[in-house]
């Protein structure tokens, strides 16, 4: 029996947003600190729309860590499972923005506080009220946090909750690409929902054709594949249905956190409509298209502003 809370496990960090766009790092004179990190962003998107979300992670006992905690709490996210440590610092990600809003990252995270979050800090009883657990690949490097993910996934599966996975590939954080690919493919069968972008598809499957790649993605417990194509729109696939929704053209200034907003708002719709794990594969084409259109609209609003969490709209702003 699943509950109503979205749990998300992984990193929260500070995105350092540049004062100028369309230039390299060495041409930027200043950066503005914004709370980010994909799992935290997903919690925030879900909470902005009025959902209940809880974040499982660890921050440095430092000014950046406390800034993140304050801002996540201001979003309404449950932080009762968030820890602090003086053994490592809060992670930083310096962002370089192109003129079209696309970005590259430079990370300071060797190790960061989140990577020291251990499986012993996970209590399976937390998941009694879990609608879903969401995770990404950034924190799946060899660290205590990797094994905390396995503990959380096991507890969520045992509780009957949906498990959602967005690989959110960040190549500079891994020793080599083969290790990253192998890790994603190891965790993929443990999930019920996979969110993957057009930029990630070929790396993980060897083909840029989503239709050809689907047999490699529908493995293990995967029931729903969300395939995002930036400004070209998004697809949703079950084994029996396919939905597509285009994106409305907007002037994007910063795409940081857009994919997180997409999956966070998609999960919010599933919870709103009482879609549990055993109902995912029964979603109709019409319902998939409806959900995709809403999440595309959510992202369209987000990318017109700087930052991730700061840019996410409320439900009233979506009307």
State where each predicted segment sits.
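Proline-centered loop/turn at the N-terminus of a beta-strand
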Residues: 52, 162, 193, 223-224
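Conserved phosphate-binding/catalytic region of the ribokinase-like
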Residues: 1-7, 154, 208-319
